[in-house]
Amino acid sequence: MKYSKHLRFVLVLVCTLIPFLLGPKVSAEENNSQVGFSVSPNYNEAQNKESSFFDLLVQPNSKQTISITVTNTSKEDSNYTVKVIQASTNKNGVIDYTDSKAKALGSVPFELNKQTSYEEKIKLSAGETKQVPITLSIPDKPFKGEVLGGVNVTKEIPKQDKTPQLVNQYSYVIGLRIREGSENSERELSAGEVKPVVSFGKTGITVPISNVQANAMGKLTVESVLKREGKEIKKDTDKDREIAPNSVYPYSLSWDK
């Protein structure tokens, strides 16, 4: 696809710094009887008692141990994968707590996958319950703002010798927020290089919007205008977008009708 040098892209960001909102303390797509297992958080003394997810107020150069309780409510032995994942921002402008491949910006206070230790694989007999400790090692260097992530527990699908078929795979996610105080870092968003893209046969542009600070942003309005030789050919407004701390929102705009 040729990208005309006469095309001009204008991006306007209107944002509000909002309190961290994660939703329910534990989320899954079905109820326990359908999923076949349950997960619940076990808080420690650093927990904000007003929060239903892990919400920790910590000190630099310290260790914190939290835990989750996993119960196999099915009638079969099952294997589970546990992962602590850094929050990222998906292409829809929503904070994502499940993408283990997403990379945080270099400005992040610390990466959860490097500062946590826990048992990643567990096996439970039918009806068995197990507590899984998670140790957080807080770095020496103090930080303002927050580090966000999620504790993900996924039930593994047994290997089948039969013909491949569509099988539901279930996961629970418990939010994790780590702070060292109530002071927030300043808001700062930056837009990267505008590039042409073709996705599912549609042409458009993509531009990375970076949140370089350690604070989640919500109620974000993105206004974009695409012009050719001064004439507007596409205009779009996206409201109520979110960006995770120290993450990139891969914003895109299609100019096809």
PLM features: residue spans?
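Sec-dependent N-terminal signal peptides of Gram-positive bacterial secreted proteins and lipoproteins
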Residues: 2-28
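Proline/serine/threonine-rich low-complexity linkers at boundaries of modular beta-sandwich domains
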Residues: 30-48, 178-188
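Beta-sheet-dominated interaction scaffolds and their linkers
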Residues: 41-74, 121, 189-200
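Ligand-binding face of N-terminal immunoglobulin V-set domains in extracellular IgSF glycoproteins
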Residues: 62-71, 78-86, 92-94, 107-163
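Short beta-strand elements
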Residues: 68, 162-183
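Short acidic, flexible loop segments centered on an aromatic residue
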Residues: 78-92, 96-105, 216-231
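Intrinsically disordered, low-complexity Pro/Gly/Ser/Thr-rich segments with frequent PxxP/GP/PP motifs
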Residues: 101-141, 226-257
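Membrane-proximal extracellular "stem/stalk" segments
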Residues: 182-257
